[in-house]
Amino acid sequence: MKPSHTIRPVFDDPNLVSTAGLVPVLALAESAGLYDLLTRLSVPSPNAGAKSVAVIGGMLAGADSIDDLDLLRHGGMPRLFAGVRASSTLGTFLRSFTYGHVQQLDAIGGDLLAGLTARVPGVIAGAQDLQGFACIDVDDTIREVHGYAKQAAANGYR
């Protein structure tokens, strides 16, 4: 006999946290100036900085789709991170990005790397004598988007 359903682990216990490792990582990002840098982002959306940090945190925790960003709201996560938006809100936020906004995020990433270098020696070899070089390779995959709920969407990044 085979069961007609699959078991899916869910972290809904208010005392459990599935991704506690985000706490030191986001604290380091904050000390390197991430939150101040995100104020330069000109996306026409309220609280763009908080939404950006939520997306970054979700990606660090393994979210690879907009729906997966909901993992930041399960279990005891609201005790650790205040103001995490719903995944549908974050999806609307991400869909408002233009090419110029992506370039702004690229500049913010470069400035954040400089801030991290000042706090974590050795992130870039040779950073002390200004001869350091860092190459960060982040690949994306563009795929067709299908589905009744995806009106007016042709391509998506993954």
Enumerate the language-model features and the residues they cover.
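Dynamic "connector" segments at or just before major functional cores
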Residues: 1-158
